[in-house]
Regions:
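Glycine/proline-rich low-complexity segments that form flexible loops, beta-turns, and polyproline
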Residues: 2-133
């Protein structure tokens, strides 16, 4: 019986430890391009300070949300936003499956050469990005 109590205590401690976010925060918001919600894309937060790891999430219907276990650490970040736009062409792979050919739909200034920045604070952050052409 005593072994069972220790086992339960140990497993409970392990479970609670696994729930910590490790200092990571949550972030959510909206992304628009030329005044319209970005239909589908990705957003990435790249730390510019001394600590943190690059993280990101999906944009759907102009909205994104990254929960604390997967979000950025507090501090300054460079923000990269991407959107793949269909070109109107199709591609057929060796299995006969047909796919849309896509290209990057946003100017480099919003991803590769991004000058977008954000300061992340502890807790849930709300950050909206209104991108221009």
């Amino acid at each position: 019986m005593r072994c069972t109590r220790w086992t339960v205590l140990f497993l409970g401690t392990v479970a609670l430890t696994g729930c910590e976010s490790g200092g990571r925060t949550g972030v959510k918001g909206t992304v628009t391009y030329a005044g319209q919600p970005l239909a589908v894309g990705t957003i990435t937060f790249v730390p510019t300070g001394e600590k943190g790891i690059k993280c990101g999430g999906r944009i759907e219907n102009g909205q994104y949300q990254i929960e604390p276990p997967f979000g950025p650490m507090p501090g300054p970040h460079r923000v990269e936003i991407r959107w793949t736009k269909p070109t109107g062409k199709k591609y057929k792979n060796e299995f006969g499956e047909v796919f849309d050919v896509t290209r990057e739909g946003l100017p480099d200034k919003h991803h590769k050469q991004s000058t977008l920045t954000a300061t992340i604070h502890a807790g849930m952050n709300v950050l909206d990005f209104n991108l221009e052409k």
